Structures are given as C-alpha cells and as structure tokens.
C-alpha cells in the first residue's frame, strides 16, 4: 500500500497541478494535458447479509491503494449512495422507476392504439341499452380495435414512433440498472469497511459527517496522492458543473430578450437601450439541453476546460442549433410522454382534490436562482421546501375581494345543486340514473362537486392583520433571495407579480413544462446562440485551476481576493464590479458552507471574513444592550420601534426547521442569525466620507435650531434601514429565537412589526405612535384600543416608487450614498410639524443520471487561450 510519505516532489512534478488564485487559469496555461490520476483504496469484504455491523479487516487482510482516473465520479457516487439512503433503497427505487416507465409505455400504447374512442362514445350500456332495446354492450367488442395499426395514418405513425423510442429508452435503463448495480455494491463495501458506516446509520447521519470520515481516511489510506482531501475539495468536485450554472444565473447570462408572456419566462433583470427587457429563462427542458451542450461538453478527461470549447463559439452555436432541431423533431413524442406521465401522476389527485391545481410550488428557474455555490442537493431541498408555506402566506397578503365575492356566489349556487343531488341519493338512489338534457344525475353530481371545490379554493382567507413586510422576511429567511428592487416595496403589486413568476400554480407550471417542449427548440436555434459569446467569456473569466481538483468556477473556490465585496464583509474588494457576485452570493455561500461543514478550516481570508462578522455582531449587540439599559431611551425608542417587541420568545422549536444551526459563526451560540444583509445595509453608516454623515450634521444642526424637528429622526433613519434587511435575510426559522432579536433596528419600512406567527396581537406592538397626524386620522380597531394616528404604509413614500428594471450587477452594486442623500434631501426640503406624517413540486425522467456522461477524452496541446 502506498503511504502518505510517498507524496514527494516527484509526484508533484509529475502531475504539474497549477493553482490560479490571482487570475483565471484559462489565461495562464490552463489546458495542460498531463494525466491526473487519483489514487483510491480498494474496498474490504462485505459483511454477512444479516448483519448491520461494519466489518473490519480480517485475517491479515490489507487495503491496497489503486489509482482511479475519475475522482469526480467517485465523489458523485459516494454522494448518490448517501442521498438515496443505502443499497436496498437504491435497488427498490430503480426497480420502481423501471416498472413505472414500463407501465407508462404500455398504458399509453393500449389507450392510444387499441381503444376505439368513437365506438366507446356510441356504445349503449345500462339503462341506455334497455331503453334502446339493444343487447347489453360488450366493451371488449365495442371499444377495442381488433387491428390497431389499420389504417396506418400519420397519427398512428407518431404513436408507433413514440412507443418505439421509449421502449428503446426503457431497455437502455434496464441494462444500465445492472451496470450500476456493481458500482453500488462497491460503494456499499466502501461505506461498510472503510468508513464503518452502515445503511441504517446513513438514514440519520449528516452528510458532513460522511465527508469528515473520508477526510480522516485520507491520512491513513492516501485516497488522493496530490494533496490532502478536504470537504471543500470534494464538494467542488461534486458540484463542478452545477456551480457554473448557478454562476451564469447569478450574473444574468441566461436572460434573453423575450416577451414576459412566453411560458417559462421569469423576472426581467435588465433592459436594453431600446427598451427590450431581458427575462431569465430556465425550464426543465432547457436545463437538460444546456447540460448536454455546455456543461457535459466543456471538460476533458482531466477535469479541465477544453481549449477548443471556449475558443470556438461557432462550434457551440452549431451544437445548440443541431440539438434544437433534434428536439423539434422529437417534440411530438416528448409531448405524448409528458401528457401521459402527468395524467397518470396528477389526474386522480386533481379529481379528488381539485384545489391542488391552485396550490403553488417553486419553478425550476427559482430553484437554480436560489441555490448557492457548493450547496448539495438534499440541503438545498430542505431549505427551499421550508419556504413554501411562507411564500403562500405572503401572496395571501394581497387579497382579491372581487374574485372572492364571485367565488363565494359560484360556490353557493353549485353547492346548492350538489346538496339537492345528495338528498335525492338518500331518498332513492335509482333516481340518480335519470336523465336531464341527455346526462344522468351522476354526471351532474360530479360536475357540481368539482365546481364547488374549485370555487371554494379561490376564496381567499380573510386575514385580520396584513403584514407583507414581515411575511416576506420569513420567505427570505429560507430563499436568501432579496433583490434590492424589492426592498421597501413588499406591499407593491410589482413585487408580488415578480414573486408569482417564481412561485407558480401547480397546474400552470405543468402546462408551462409541456409548452416548453416546443419553445425550447426555438430558444436553442435562435435565441441562446446570441448569448454564446457571453457564456464562453464567463467561463474564461471565472475558471480557476485548483491543485488536486482541476478547473472549477472561481466563485465556488471562495476567492475573496478576486471576487470579494466589502459591503458583505469581505476582507478584500474586487477591483472590478463585474468580478463580484450579485447580492453577495459568494459571501452567503461561504457562510452557508462553513456552517454546514463545521470541521472544514478555511484560509486566512475566510477567517478574516468571519472575524469581520463577529466584530460587527458584537458591536451591534453592545449598542442594543446599551440602548436597553437606559429605561428612558428604551421607552422613547419603543414608541418608534415596534419591532423591538419581537424579541419575545415565540416557541422557537415549533416550526420543525432547524437549519439555522448551519449558519453559525460561533459554535457556542446556536441562535445566531444571518448577518450579511444587515452588514451590507450598515456599511453606509461606517464610512467616514459617506454623504449620510453630512446629512446627519445637517439634521443635528436643525435639531438644535428648532423644537418642531423630531428629536429621533437621525436615529430612526439609521436603524430603520437595518431592521428590514437584517430580518429579511436571516437564514432560517431560528431567527425567531435569535439572541439578536434584541438588536432589530428599524427597517426601511418600520411597519409590520407584529410577527406573522404570533398569536398575540397587542395594540402597543402594532405600529408607530410617536407622531400624531391630525390630517389623516386612522380608524380605530376597537374602542378599548388607542386610535392609530399614523399610516403604517406611508413609509414607502420615502423611497423611490418607480419600478426600474436594471441588470443584476447594477442593481446590487448601486452605492448606498444615493439612498441616504435622497432621504436626507427629502427630509430637509420640507417644514416638519408634529402633525406631519414622518415614516416610511419537478418533473424528472427516470434514470436522469444517464445524461451525466463522463468527460470526453481529448488530446489538447498545452497552450493558452489568449
């Protein structure tokens, strides 16, 4: 067995790994064609079939090290075995998928070829047969084609082609089942004998623990001869291709100049000079094709980006056109399969529970938009699924009274007819066989029942308290997505409409996926090729060579020196704005990764990043503790900061989502919130040359000059800008139990202080009662409660209400000075009196991994691309 001591200079010179930290490796000799073999140990013997105890090395058995050429494939299968929860779960899953696919083929073939639908419609059975004097019908004779292929029409040819195509696909999956079974058994051996983890333990063991065991195994069995393995290296290998797709979306490269009404079109992220809006698009079908054309084709067998791929955009454009043309030819067969699949999966559910069609789920675009760098699949699903309830609650903040009124009337009328039919059924069941207008009463009962269920689902709940800001903050706790254009406008229809493009009705999303089968070929042939140059330039600019890993997206490598943003706590600031990630996604991804893998030790810049956040957190905690220690100041600020009452504990374990433990900075403080957006909004107050200081000086002078000026306006402006963004960017449900709930500065909109999940609705915690408006008195909710003299939504008027569409980079990198100068200018441009208002669900084909082909082996020269 090769020990770790064998890793010497000769080995390093043989592999010639290069680390491109300061610049893209694609511009510094990226494509070296040396063979990069990774050494991996053999597996020990499998334990006895009935035993769950992992076996060790018996009878002097030794584990020899043998090199493997594809460490990416090893990490991928290691994770797949963990995600699918062991050997028997994998076997059962594959068997069920094969049976399901076979059933779809047989089911659709029988009903599309053998069933005579015209004969079935004209067949007379039951009372109809008796009344017509015919013999009782025989469905086999009446509705079954004895010769299904006669006559052989164009429709029949399409159906036969569909059956033949998917039959071949089923046979391919069947053979692949046995081919993968051997690899699955090998990885079971590896888990049992090398990691000492059984299938039962996998069910409850965190993924980070599995990686820790692999890292520990490296020291004794030399899994990688180039360098010591780390959790970061293995996850970068696992998500090598996915990180590029996440980066492309983050930089807006998958936005196309299409109309908003095209199925699958997401939010607009930028506008052209001529007014054309670019909408993000990533349907499931488009994702598959981009995966085939770009992600699976860009790497060679050494996990390096192929030089000819990035230097020849014409080849990629041709490939996109050919794939689009092939999809256009296959689209009739794909549509048939999708229709049959969706019918079998959802028809019974929609029939018995029609309201299911009006439920919502995140679109495929939103999932990739929310996903972070190096975030593995099961952790992301847990996070995104936790946001569904809160996203639904947010959309309920925008009631539709007219629709509810009409739906109540329709439900009342249809429910009345359904009730009459129920009474008839109780009196005499045979009466239901009677006919009215050619239909029996059973048919009417089904129709009225369905109409009643759908209309009742359209009736919106009557919310006693509308709090779009607070509800949006709960959404962002899990999605970590809060565009700057949303802040301060949570109660606007524009934000609601944009969220609805990401959080769609289930029925509408299924229809869009079917329509995307025809739209994707058009995009591939005529739209996507126009962005090929930008996509390849992104790959050039954001690819680095990591020793022992290969080429990866530089965002996933957490290079603060090249891509850092000091507004999000980075110790370095990228010289060019284009090098930074949008909305601080790299910084958020780093914090998430550090919390998910606590045993991983980052570099010095990463530690400095965490230190910056700790310092910021401690300073804010000290400020709030000082504020609360003064009774007079606490009382004065409580009138201006209703959100401070949110620090009351509210059953922190009730939600059942404990993912916030992943967002720890200090392991001893398990109630730590997510600080990055709070840090971002607070940087405006910490700059010595920031215009807000000039505004504060003016405010102070005016405060001393007049008694009518609100004495806490300066404090209100600073704290109000912090609250909403800190609250809306916390990483998860534990924000409700966080110790930093005491440190909630007033948000951009200080309204919405009542917690959405708080059953208590005390009047003293509802709004800001510091200023009394005699010009706009509010209605009193109850005679025992003080009147609300302030419009809680007037806060939004202090912001720019124009809905501007900008590019992602421009939106997130806009300087905070503009906001503060504008606020100060507006406050100083008017005479302020005491009576003035002064506030502010996826469709996956079976064996979807069949598209994950191994990197293409190419022989490229060691030359630079530029």
Curated annotation (Swiss-Prot):
A Pfam family assignment: ATG9
Region named Disordered: 744-781
Record-stated family: Belongs to the ATG9 family.
Compositional bias (Polar residues): 768-781
Record-given protein name: Autophagy-related protein 9
Disruption phenotype: Mutant plants are hypersensitive to nitrogen or carbon starvation and show early bolting senescence.
Transmembrane segments: 95-115, 154-174, 405-425, 434-454
Source organism of this protein record: Arabidopsis thaliana (Mouse-ear cress)
Residue numbers on the Lumenal membrane side: 116-153, 426-433
Role, per record: Phospholipid scramblase involved in autophagy by mediating autophagosomal membrane expansion. Cycles between the preautophagosomal structure/phagophore assembly site (PAS) and the cytoplasmic vesicle pool and supplies membrane for the growing autophagosome. Lipid scramblase activity plays a key role in preautophagosomal structure/phagophore assembly by distributing the phospholipids that arrive through ATG2 from the cytoplasmic to the luminal leaflet of the bilayer, thereby driving autophagosomal membrane expansion. In addition to autophagy, also plays a role in necrotic cell death.
Residues in compartment: Cytoplasmic: 1-94, 175-319, 341-404, 455-507, 529-866
């Amino acid at each position: 067995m090769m020990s770790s001591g064998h890793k010497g200079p000769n080995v390093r010179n043989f592999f010639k790994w290069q680390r491109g930290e300061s610049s893209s490796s694609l511009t510094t000799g990226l494509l070296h064609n040396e063979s990069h073999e990774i050494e991996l140990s053999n597996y020990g013997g499998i334990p006895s079939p009935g035993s769950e105890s992992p076996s060790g090395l018996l009878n002097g058995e030794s584990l020899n090290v043998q090199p493997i050429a594809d460490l990416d494939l090893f990490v991928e299968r290691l994770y797949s075995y963990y995600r699918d929860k062991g050997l028997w779960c994998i076997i059962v899953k594959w068997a069920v998928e094969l049976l399901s696919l076979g059933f779809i083929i047989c089911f659709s073939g029988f009903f599309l070829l053998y069933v005579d639908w015209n004969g079935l419609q004209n067949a007379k059975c039951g009372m109809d047969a008796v009344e017509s004097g015919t013999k009782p019908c025989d469905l086999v004779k009446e509705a079954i084609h004895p010769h299904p292929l006669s006559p052989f029409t164009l429709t029949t040819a399409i159906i036969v082609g569909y059956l033949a195509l998917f039959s071949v696909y089923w046979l391919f999956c069947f053979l692949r089942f046995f081919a993968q079974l051997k690899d699955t058994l090998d990885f079971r051996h590896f888990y049992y004998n090398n990691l000492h983890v059984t299938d039962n333990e996998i069910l409850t063991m965190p993924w980070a623990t599995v990686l820790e065991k692999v890292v520990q195994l490296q020291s004794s069995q030399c899994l990688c001869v180039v360098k010591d393995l780390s959790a970061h290296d293995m996850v970068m290998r696992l998500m090598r291709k996915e990180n590029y797709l996440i980066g492309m979306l983050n930089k807006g490269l998958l936005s196309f100049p299409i109309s908003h009404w095209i199925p699958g079109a997401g939010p607009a992220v930028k506008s052209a000079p001529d007014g054309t809006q670019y909408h993000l698009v990533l349907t499931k079908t488009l994702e598959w094709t981009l995966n085939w054309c770009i992600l699976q084709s860009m790497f060679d067998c050494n996990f390096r980006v192929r030089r000819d791929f990035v230097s020849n955009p014409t080849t990629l454009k041709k490939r996109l056109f050919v794939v689009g043309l092939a999809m256009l030819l296959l689209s009739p067969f794909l549509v048939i399969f999708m229709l049959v699949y969706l019918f079998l999966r959802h028809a019974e559910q929609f029939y018995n529970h029609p309201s299911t069609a009006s439920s919502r789920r995140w679109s495929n675009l939103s999932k990739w938009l929310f996903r972070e760098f190096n975030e593995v699949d099961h952790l992301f699903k847990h996070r995104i699924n936790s946001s569904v309830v809160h996203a639904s609650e947010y959309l309920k903040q925008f009631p539709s009274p007219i629709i509810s009124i009409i739906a109540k009337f329709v439900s009342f009328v249809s429910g009345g007819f359904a009730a009459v039919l129920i009474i008839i059924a109780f009196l005499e069941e045979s009466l239901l066989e009677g006919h009215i207008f050619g239909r029996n009463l059973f048919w009417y009962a089904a129709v009225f029942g369905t109409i009643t269920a759908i209309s009742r689902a359209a009736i919106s709940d009557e919310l006693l308290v509308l709090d779009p800001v607070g509800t949006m903050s709960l959404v962002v706790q899990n999605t970590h997505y809060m565009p700057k254009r949303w802040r301060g406008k949570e109660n606007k229809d524009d934000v609601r409409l944009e969220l609805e493009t990401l959080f769609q009705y289930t029925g509408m999303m299924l229809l869009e996926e079917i329509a995307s089968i025809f739209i994707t070929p058009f995009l591939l042939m005529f739209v996507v090729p126009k962005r090929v140059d930008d996509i390849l330039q992104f790959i050039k600019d954001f690819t680095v060579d990591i020793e022992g890993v290969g080429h990866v997206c530089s965002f996933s490598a957490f290079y603060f020196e090249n891509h850092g943003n000091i507004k999000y706590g980075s110790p370095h600031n990228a010289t060019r704005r284009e090098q930074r990630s949008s909305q601080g996604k790299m910084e958020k991804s780093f914090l998430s990764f550090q919390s998910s893998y606590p045993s991983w030790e980052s570099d010095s810049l990463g530690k400095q990043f965490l230190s910056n956040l700790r310092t910021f957190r401690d300073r804010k905690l000290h400020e709030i503790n000082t504020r609360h220690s003064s009774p007079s100041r606490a009382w004065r600020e409580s009138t201006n900061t209703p959100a401070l009452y949110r620090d009351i504990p509210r059953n922190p374990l009730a939600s059942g989502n404990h993912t916030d433990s992943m967002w720890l900075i200090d392991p001893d403080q398990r109630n730590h919130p997510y600080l990055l957006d709070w840090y971002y909004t607070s940087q405006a107050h910490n700059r010595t040359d920031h215009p807000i200081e000039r505004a504060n000086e003016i405010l102070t002078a005016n405060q001393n000059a007049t008694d009518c000026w609100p004495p806490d306006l300066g404090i209100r402006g600073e704290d109000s800008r912090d609250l909403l963004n800190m609250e809306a960017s916390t990483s998860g449900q534990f924000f409700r139990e966080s110790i930093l709930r005491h440190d909630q500065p007033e948000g951009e909109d200080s309204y919405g202080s009542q917690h959405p999940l708080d059953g208590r609705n005390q009047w003293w915690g509802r709004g800001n009662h510091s200023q009394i408006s005699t010009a706009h008195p509010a209605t009193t909710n109850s005679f025992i409660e003080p009147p609300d003299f302030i419009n809680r939504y007037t806060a939004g008027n202090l912001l720019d209400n124009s809905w501007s569409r900008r590019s992602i980079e421009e939106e997130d990198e806009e300087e905070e000075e503009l906001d503060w100068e504008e606020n100060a200018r507006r406050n100083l441009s008017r005479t302020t009196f005491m009576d003035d208002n002064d506030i502010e669900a996826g469709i996956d084909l079976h064996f979807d991994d069949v598209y994950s082909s191994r990197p293409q082996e190419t022989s490229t020269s060691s030359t630079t691309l530029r």
